[in-house]
Amino acid sequence: MIINTGYYSDRLFYLANTAKKFYKNIKSIKYVPWNEIDLIDKKLNWIVSCYTETSTGMKLPIEELYKLKKRCNAKLLLDATASIGLETKHYIADVIAYSSCKGLFGLTGASFIAYNKDPKNEIESFYLNLENHKNKSMTGPYHTIQSLFLILKNYDQFKFTVKVNKDKFLKQFGYLSPFKKKFQPLLCTYVNKKIETEFQNAILYLPRLKLPGSVLCHLGEVHLKKRSKGQILSKLKIL
C-alpha cells in the first residue's frame, strides 16, 4: 500500500506499478489518501510513504505511520529525501531511501538506501542489485558525496537556520496554512495564498503540482548559519 501525499507519492505509485509488471510476487498495490489511513486495519506486506512531501508542504507524523505499520503487521518504507536530518525517528521504518539534496542540503545526484535486514529477493537488473553497489561494481556519484563533506561538519548550524525561518514564518503566516502543527515539516510550509518576491537573491520553490497556494522552502538563510534571524522573510509578498 502506498499513501497518497502528492507528486512524490505519485512517483512511488508509478514505480511500484512498473515493478509489478516484472515481479510476479507483487500481487496488488493500493493507493490510499493520507487522510484515510486511520481507516486501514487489514494485513499488508508493505506500507510506502513520503515522510515529508514537499510538493504539498506537509509531513505525515511518524508516530501515526508506526501505528499503521503495527496495526497492519506490515513493513514500512519511507521516502526520506526531505526529512532526513531534519525530522526524527527514521529508525521506525524498515527501509528508508533518500537523496543528497533537500534534507541533507547537498547537491543532487546521489541516492542512499538504509535498511534493517538484507533483502532476500533476486534482482536481475545490474544497477538495482544492491550487492553490485556494495561491491563498487559501478562508478558512484563521488562529486556529489564529496559536497556533503563540509556540509555534514556544519550540519547543525544549517539546520538551525531552517528552524529559525520555519518558526518565524509560522508565527507570521501560520494562519494561512491548512495543516495542523503535527503535519508541519521543518523544511517547508504550504499556505493557501500565492507568494511573490522582487528580491533577486530569493529563489522561490516551485512545487511539481499546480496548487491554489504556495509552498515556501526554508533554505534561504543556510549560508548565515548561527547568524540567521529569518530576515529574508521580510522580502516576501503574500498576495
Cite the ranges covered by each PLM segment.
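Conserved PLP-anchoring active-site segment centered on the Schiff-base-forming lysine
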Residues: 1-9
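Active-site-proximal loop->helix
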Residues: 11-21
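Active-site phosphate-binding strand-loop segment of PLP-dependent enzymes
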Residues: 31-80, 84
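Conserved active-site segment immediately N-terminal to the catalytic lysine
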Residues: 90-101
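Active-site C-terminal subdomain of aminotransferase-like
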Residues: 101-171
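Conserved PLP-dependent catalytic core of the aminotransferase class-I/II
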Residues: 152-184, 192-199
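Conserved C-terminal alpha-helix-loop-beta "cap" of PLP-dependent enzymes
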Residues: 177-239
